[in-house]
């Protein structure tokens, strides 16, 4: 059942949250640079937790697909649709949890003082350059587990090149941050910007495939309204600022020169992918509006 799969994944987050120490707070309520730092030695433990999350996401997807195969009243039971729909249900769960938690963690680091510090990545400041906290690493393990499970699904069923590249990108940055215990500001903000519109995309896909015209149009509008400013506006702006900071040497002390430049190029690639996707999205949106008027 989709609700059961959602509860299943949420329980995983709650269980792993028990192991994470709360963020330390400074005088202004932001993260203490020295609080709850995760040493690189904990990388093996985080890898195990990532694997557990991946297994839970995969199991949740399988259970959801089995339910949809039998729940003919939802009109998502034909052919490979149950598997594709289950992937969207799990995606909605992950994106909702990860984007909200990432936004909270970005705020804890002081990253929301200015407009997402778009023109000066806050990694160069004291708050941003502080070691990763246990809570941040738990969220990274949660997201990495999802991307591993979904990547296996994509390779087996849909094989969408854009999404495969997206998952490879994230599975480069997120685990590196967990293993090194540094640079949490980058995946935190990237996830907050990149995943916030995903729930609308998943729900729109489900409504469209099920033939629910009542929900399809408003969900499409909600996705477009959230995707364009976040993924076409803010994310490319942040990627450009991150590129400048990385190649100017400002982030060398935090991430190391090679890692800073690698992450900057990957974030820029994500921004470019968003622009390509947006072009197709806007074209489809305008086409749909013309058909409605006709």
Segments and roles (model prediction):
Residues 11-18, 23, 27-193, 198-201, ...:
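Membrane-helix and juxtamembrane interface regions of eukaryotic multi-pass membrane proteins
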């Amino acid at each position: 059942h989709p609700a059961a799969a959602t509860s299943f994944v949420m329980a995983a987050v709650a269980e792993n949250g028990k192991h994470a120490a709360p963020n330390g707070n400074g005088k202004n309520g932001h993260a203490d640079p020295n609080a709850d730092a995760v040493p690189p030695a904990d990388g093996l433990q985080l890898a195990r937790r990532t694997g557990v999350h991946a297994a839970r996401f995969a199991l949740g997807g399988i259970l959801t697909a089995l339910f949809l195969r039998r729940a003919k009243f939802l009109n998502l039971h034909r052919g490979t649709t149950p598997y594709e729909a289950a992937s969207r249900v799990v995606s909605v769960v992950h994106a909702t949890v990860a984007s909200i938690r990432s936004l909270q963690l970005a705020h804890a680091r002081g990253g929301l003082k200015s407009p997402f510090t778009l023109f000066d990545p806050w990694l160069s400041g004291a708050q941003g350059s502080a070691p990763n906290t246990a809570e941040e690493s738990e969220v990274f393990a949660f997201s990495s587990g999802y991307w591993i499970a979904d990547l296996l699904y994509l390779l087996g069923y849909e094989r969408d090149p854009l999404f495969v590249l997206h998952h490879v990108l994230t599975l480069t940055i997120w685990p590196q941050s967990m293993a090194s215990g540094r640079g949490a500001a980058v995946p935190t903000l990237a996830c907050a910007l990149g995943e916030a519109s995903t729930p609308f995309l998943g729900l729109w896909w489900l409504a469209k495939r099920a033939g629910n015209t009542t929900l399809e149009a408003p969900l499409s509008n909600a996705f477009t309204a959230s995707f364009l400013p976040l993924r076409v506006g803010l994310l490319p702006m942040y990627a450009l600022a991150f590129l400048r900071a990385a190649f100017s040497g400002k982030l060398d002390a935090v991430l190391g020169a090679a890692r800073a430049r690698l992450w900057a190029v990957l974030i820029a690639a994500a921004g470019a992918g968003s622009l390509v996707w947006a072009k197709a999205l806007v074209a489809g949106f305008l086409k749909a509006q013309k058909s409605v008027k006709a």
